[in-house]
Design a protein with these regions (language model features):
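Donor-nucleotide binding loops and adjacent catalytic segments primarily
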Residues: 1-39, 70-74, 78, 85-95
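A donor-sugar binding/catalytic signature common to diverse glycosyltransferases
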Residues: 27-68
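C-terminal alpha-helical cap of glycosyltransferases
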Residues: 121-140
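A short, well-ordered alpha-helix in the C-terminal region of glycosyltransferases
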Residues: 108-122
Length: 140
């Protein structure tokens, strides 16, 4: 929470239209407007961004079980659909330098968006249901 006010000031100073909060209950009202998401790397968040085709900057929680947040984000990074940063990158200035480069390259954001969409499987659960229902149960 301590970084929220700092981030808001930075965006305002640089005339970047943004919605900054620690949690959005009504994420659907915002995700369609976003050209870039900055968030943690939980699986639900990542899948929402993939399906929406929105490139993201992820800050995985260091102490997540099995380092799963980093592993989640790494799949997207390897597919050029997201960037990964550590919390230490905020204080060191690394993050702001990279963020400035990212947001001033619309073609890069467009490419990462395209790559996200290619990773998505929006009808996967429906397809799985169809496969399961099509299986013939045989008497043993």
């Amino acid at each position: 929470y301590e970084h929220l006010s700092v981030v808001k000031k930075i965006y305002k100073k640089n005339n970047i239209k943004s919605y900054v909060n620690s949690f959005f209950k009504d994420i659907n009202n915002y995700i369609g407007k976003a050209s870039l998401v900055i968030s943690r790397a939980g699986s639900s968040t990542i899948h929402e961004n993939i399906i929406a085709g929105i490139p993201a900057i992820y800050f995985p929680i260091k102490n997540s079980v099995g380092n799963h947040q980093y592993e989640n984000a790494l799949v997207l990074k390897k597919n050029k659909a997201a960037w990964i940063f550590n919390e230490e990158d905020i204080g060191s200035g690394i993050f702001l330098k990279r963020l400035s480069k990212i947001i001033t390259q619309p073609e890069l954001l467009k490419q990462f968006s395209f790559n996200n969409k290619n990773l998505g499987k929006p009808f996967a659960s429906q397809r799985l249901k169809e496969i399961i229902l099509s299986l013939e149960v045989k008497d043993v």
